[in-house]
Every structure is written in structure tokens, then in C-alpha cells.
Amino acid sequence: ESIKQIGVVSPLIVRPDPEGGFEILSGHRRLHAAQLAGLETVPVIVKEMDDDAAIIFMVDSNLQRENILPSERAFSYKMKLEAMKHQGERSDLQPETTSRQLGEKLQTSVAVMSEEMGESQRQIQRFIRLTNLIPEILDMVDEKKIAFNPAVELSYLKPSEQKEFLEAMDYAQASHYLS
């Protein structure tokens, strides 16, 4: 309703799309609201950035939302970490990287993320662990049916073991109602 009356106050952030037009980096919801309000134009800021920088920008924008699900935070942290690991690399010039070098780069990236996000390195790594959960269990975390700490522990199980856990939980719930 306010968008209908005064328009979009905060500009969308976009970058040029190589195939023509623009890619929205921040402001998808504002654009949708503007379209629903019948607006034909919205203010934008055009930024030049490569794919990794765009991913980091989008993730940072999403993480600033107030109501973000644990799964959204988990995948956002994982995406940002992957993009940070790629930044500044030229794959055509890179020699074979050792697992030790990869581990050091990962720790450096997590430390930088920790500073930027105001979240401990351990907590960031624990959120990223949630991306190893099967979708059914991850949904239960988002719905607050499984708490964060037990979910992190479940993430260390193989997908088949997670399914067995889920079946055991369903059975226990069903037998509880039968008694």
C-alpha cells in the first residue's frame, strides 16, 4: 500500500546481464510489490561485478532480512564461502592445489565471514553443516520441530541413516498416538 502511494524508496541493485537487460542482485521483493501496485518504473543502481562478487552481494543482502530460516542462512553461508574461495583466482594459471592449501583458504574465508557477519567461526561452520541434511529433516529444522544443535549432529549421518532416523521418529510418534 505504501509503495502504491509513494513508490519504491530504496533502489534495487542490478548488474548488466551479458545476454541483455539486467540481473537483480537486491530488491526482488520491492520489484514484486511495485508490480502489484501497478508501477511501471522503479529506481535502480547499476553495479559492475563478476559472478562471485554478485553471489556475495546477494547473500549479504538476504542475510540482512529479519526473518531468515535456518536453511536459508545455511545455504547463504555456504554460497558465500564458495564465492569467497573463488575470488581472485584464475583457474587457467593455478597449479594443483594441495588439500592443506585448500584447508587454509577455507579457514581464512570462514574467519573473514565471521568478522563480517558478527557470528563465530564455529557457528558459521555449524550452519553450513545443515546443508548436509536431507530435505525432510531440514524442513523440520525450519519448522522448529528439530532444534538447531541436534540437527547439526544429525548432519554427520549419511543420507540413508538420516532417512532411518526419520522413519524411527515417525514410528515413535505413531505408536505414541496408538497407546
Indicate where each model-derived feature is located.
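Short, proline-centered helix/strand-breaking motifs
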Residues: 9-11, 134, 158, 176
